[in-house]
C-alpha cells in the first residue's frame, strides 16, 4: 500500500492549507494498523500520535539523523522493552538511550526467566506483603524475583571487568554482554533490551545511577571492597559528544532527534546535551532538530516532565527553526509505544547501525580538543587591561568603604 501524502500541520503555511475537513467513514473490518492511524486518528491526542508516527517514519528515522531515546516510567515490567523498544534498536532507529536504572533492572527479570503476572490494581497490598509479592500497579511478581536478580547482579559485578572507574554506557555494555551470554545458555534470544543494545552497539546511559536496584547492588559490593566507581562526568561528556557530532552525518547535514518516552531525569539528561555544548563548553550549537514526547505530565506545574518544546527553545535545547518538527502526545506510553513501533516498522526500511558505543572515546577526544581550543581563545580575549577587582566566590565585586 502506498504511503499517503501527508500535510504536516506544523509546516509554515496559511490555515486554509492544512485545515483538512474531517470526513467520517465506517472503519472497514480488514483495515491495517497504518491505515487506521493515517485515516482515523483525526483529532486530540489520537491526532498527535498520528503526527508522531508520521514524523518518525518520514523524517526522523533517516540515516542522517542521530536519534536519542529517553525512557522513564515502569515500561520494561510491562514487557515493552522486549516487544517495542528492542525491535526499534535492531532496526537501527535508536542510536543511544538514556533510561532510568529501574527500567534496566526490571528488564533483566525476563532474561533470567523470571515470571511477572498481569493482574489488576484493586488488591490488598497488606496481604501481598504477607505473601511476599510485589505490585507495580497491575503487575504482580514474587519477592524472589528481586532477590534472584540482585544475586545475579552482584555475581556479575564482582568480576574483574567491573573493577575500575567507568561511565554507565560502559557499565551497561558489559552487563549486556553477560545477559547476552545468559540468553545463549537458555536458548532464548531477544529476551532483554540490555542484550539487544549490546549486540547493536547502542550505548545506554542512566542519569541517576544510584537511584535503582542496580545502583543499590553497586553500593552493596562497594562495602565488600569493590573498585567499581560509576562516574557521571563520563556520561555527560559522552552524550554531549554524540549530540555535537550528529551534525557531521550526510556531509555536515546531519540532524539530532530527541524521542522522549515519559519525562523525568532521563528527559533532562537527553536535552541537556545541548546546553552542555553551548553554555558550558562554549561551542556553537543550535539545539536538537526534532523533539517528540509521549507523556501524561502537565506543563503548567513547572516540572521538567511536562515542559513543552517551545520552553526548551529558551534554554537552547531545541533549535527554534525546528519547532515545526516537534510533537507532544498526552497519553499513556504503554498505549502509544506499541502503536508507534508497529507503524514505523511497517513504514520504514531499517537503517544501518551507527554503533555509537564503539565511537565514544574518539568523539570525546575530539570534543575535548575543541573545548580546550575554545577556552584558550576565550582567555586570550579576556586578558586584563586594568588591575583585577576583588570578588566574592560567586563573582560579585567586593565593595570597598
Swiss-Prot record:
InterPro entries the record matches: Deoxyhypusine_synthase, Deoxyhypusine_synthase-like, Deoxyhypusine_synthase_sf, DHS-like_NAD/FAD-binding_dom
A Gene Ontology term for the protein's cellular component: cytoplasm
Keyword Transferase appears in the UniProt entry: yes
GO molecular function: deoxyhypusine synthase activity
Main EC class the enzyme belongs to: transferase
Keyword Kinase in record: no
Pfam families: DS
EC numbers for this chain: 2.5.-.-
Keyword tags: Transferase
Family from the record: Belongs to the deoxyhypusine synthase family.
This protein's name: Deoxyhypusine synthase-like protein
